[in-house]
Amino acid sequence: MEQTNFRYLKREDIEDDLDFASVDVSFISLTKILIPARNLLKENGEMVCLIKPQFEAGREKVGKNGVVREPEVHREVICKIVDYADSIGFTVLELEYSPIKGPEGNIEYLVHLRKEKEPEEAVRLLTEQDAENRLKEIIAGKSGLSQTEVWQTLIRETVERSHSMEEKHSMEEKQES
């Protein structure tokens, strides 16, 4: 849905529940649209979301021209999105880096989510602010899904692969010039 503020989209704004959604938002965090998106998906509906570190990291972590280059910042951003999605009732299925960089050269990532079933009422009724507060508690307590050994490994390896491909492309470009 081009030119639509997804944050404010309601179930009655669309004809049917969605089987699938692809999400590519700019100038806003994914955390702002995951609850509305979840409410529009069918049970077992899936989403693939583009994680853009330049819009997830704080301003102090974004470099010149809006580019985030530090692998540690990429890991932090991915952990935040994985933990947030998990905390609002998504199953996080997969993570990979995008083979296409953002316009300024940002490395971006793809996360695959599934709405398994209706969550407990407390999760279903979460407001955006409630979910953000819950995420802060998860991050402070280092207790989220991203802190499990499996996800720590997946996140680390994905970020390492994305940065090694970035280095490879940079070297190829230098050789061509």
Predicted regions, residues:
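Residue-level signal for inorganic ion chemistry
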Residues: K52, G105
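Short, glycine-/aromatic-enriched active-site segment of Class I SAM-dependent methyltransferases
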Residues: P53-E70
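Short alpha-helix
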Residues: H74-I88
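Flexible, glycine-/basic-rich loop-and-beta segments that form/coincide
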Residues: I107, V111-E167, E172-S177
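S-adenosyl-L-methionine
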Residues: M1-I28
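Conserved S-adenosyl-L-methionine
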Residues: F90-P99
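Short "lid" loop at the C-terminus of a central beta-strand within the Rossmann-like core
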Residues: F6-R7, P53-A57, P99-I100
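A short glycine-rich, Lys/Arg-flanked "PGG" loop and its adjoining helix->strand segment in the class I
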Residues: T31-E46
